[in-house]
């Protein structure tokens, strides 16, 4: 358990199973440009969404322990699978460090945005199987109707850089057909990899559907939480994020450039 003193100058730690958390990194950079950011993508063990709960909880503890070595003031769990099945492990491992999970932030935003009261959720097999999104949304309003759909192929498609590809469109059409006749007006991207494929998903879902990106929701939540605890970095300087991966740094570099639209800072290869 951490006992180090929280400082406004300490970094924000973000972790995900792979590149999906870059959607959170990008949103946090936009919302909090003065903050020092630390990112870990567990590219050696992606995807998490097909693993057992025991394995996911083990990975969550190890990922958190890695970030804790850098004494962060806040840890953002940029993985919906971990948020659904192992947020308590992260909180226990982090001790006195602030923790935010993307799942609750996305659920709250969806509950407040829907007008019809019918919400669709797409996510990994583990996230959807946990029923965590349905529970979190209904905690906000138990009258809301939630239709979940597991989309296990989206993560490998995003990891391979198939961002706007015929194969991705074909898979998306099959998955999103689950919402035909459900009359949803809101669709939660319940995995941080999915905003990478947002253009395809949005075009198939149609303009009448409000897309909820949990990355934007969690960035707003992070700003609110740091402000509440007096931990916002007041510096006007901006710094490059410190990036770490557990495998394939060159592939991560290529996908970072493709998605973020900027050159990649140095990437540190770490063993898990």
Curated annotation (Swiss-Prot):
<feature type="binding site">
    <location>
        <begin position="16"/>
        <end position="17"/>
    </location>
    <ligand>
        <name>substrate</name>
    </ligand>
</feature>
<keyword id="KW-0133">Cell shape</keyword>
<dbReference type="InterPro" id="IPR004391">
    <property type="entry name" value="Glu_race"/>
</dbReference>
<keyword id="KW-0961">Cell wall biogenesis/degradation</keyword>
<protein>
    <recommendedName>
        <fullName>Glutamate racemase</fullName>
        <ecNumber>5.1.1.3</ecNumber>
    </recommendedName>
</protein>
<feature type="active site" description="Proton donor/acceptor">
    <location>
        <position position="191"/>
    </location>
</feature>
<dbReference type="GO" id="GO:0071555">
    <property type="term" value="P:cell wall organization"/>
</dbReference>
<dbReference type="GO" id="GO:0008881">
    <property type="term" value="F:glutamate racemase activity"/>
</dbReference>
<dbReference type="InterPro" id="IPR001920">
    <property type="entry name" value="Asp/Glu_race"/>
</dbReference>
<keyword id="KW-0413">Isomerase</keyword>
<dbReference type="InterPro" id="IPR015942">
    <property type="entry name" value="Asp/Glu/hydantoin_racemase"/>
</dbReference>
<feature type="binding site">
    <location>
        <begin position="48"/>
        <end position="49"/>
    </location>
    <ligand>
        <name>substrate</name>
    </ligand>
</feature>
<feature type="active site" description="Proton donor/acceptor">
    <location>
        <position position="79"/>
    </location>
</feature>
<dbReference type="GO" id="GO:0009252">
    <property type="term" value="P:peptidoglycan biosynthetic process"/>
</dbReference>
<dbReference type="Pfam" id="PF01177">
    <property type="entry name" value="Asp_Glu_race"/>
</dbReference>
<comment type="pathway">
    <text>Cell wall biogenesis; peptidoglycan biosynthesis.</text>
</comment>
<keyword id="KW-0573">Peptidoglycan synthesis</keyword>
<dbReference type="GO" id="GO:0008360">
    <property type="term" value="P:regulation of cell shape"/>
</dbReference>
<comment type="function">
    <text>Provides the (R)-glutamate required for cell wall biosynthesis.</text>
</comment>
<comment type="similarity">
    <text>Belongs to the aspartate/glutamate racemases family.</text>
</comment>
<feature type="binding site">
    <location>
        <begin position="192"/>
        <end position="193"/>
    </location>
    <ligand>
        <name>substrate</name>
    </ligand>
</feature>
<feature type="binding site">
    <location>
        <begin position="80"/>
        <end position="81"/>
    </location>
    <ligand>
        <name>substrate</name>
    </ligand>
</feature>
<dbReference type="InterPro" id="IPR033134">
    <property type="entry name" value="Asp/Glu_racemase_AS_2"/>
</dbReference>
């Amino acid at each position: 358990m951490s006992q180090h003193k929280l400082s406004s100058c300490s970094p924000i730690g973000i972790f995900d199973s792979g590149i999906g958390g870059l959607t959170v990194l990008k949103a946090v950079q936009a919302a909090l440009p003065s903050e020092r950011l630390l990112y870990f993508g567990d590219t050696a063990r992606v995807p998490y969404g097909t693993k057992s709960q025991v394995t996911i909880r083990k990975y969550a503890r190890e990922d958190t322990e890695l970030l804790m070595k850098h004494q962060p003031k806040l840890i953002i769990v940029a993985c919906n699978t971990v948020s659904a099945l192992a947020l308590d492990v992260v909180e226990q491992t982090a001790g006195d460090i602030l923790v935010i999970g993307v799942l609750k932030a996305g659920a709250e935003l969806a509950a407040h945005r829907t007008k019809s009261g019918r919400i669709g959720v797409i996510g990994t097999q583990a996230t959807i199987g946990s029923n965590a999104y349905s529970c979190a949304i209904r905690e906000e309003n138990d009258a809301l109707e939630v239709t979940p759909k597991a989309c296990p192929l989206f993560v490998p498609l995003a990891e391979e850089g198939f961002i706007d590809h015929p194969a991705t469109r074909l898979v998306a059409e099959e998955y999103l057909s689950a919402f035909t006749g459900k009359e949803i007006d809101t669709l939660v991207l319940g995995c941080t990899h999915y905003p990478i494929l947002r253009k395809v998903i949005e075009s198939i879902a149609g303009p009448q559907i409000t897309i909820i990106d949990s990355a934007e929701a969690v960035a707003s939540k992070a700003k609110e939480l740091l402000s509440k605890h007096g931990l916002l970095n007041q510096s006007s300087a901006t710094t490059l994020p410190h990036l770490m991966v557990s495998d394939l740094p060159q592939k991560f570099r290529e996908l970072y450039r493709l998605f973020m639209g900027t050159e990649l800072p140095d990437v540190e290869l770490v063993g898990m």
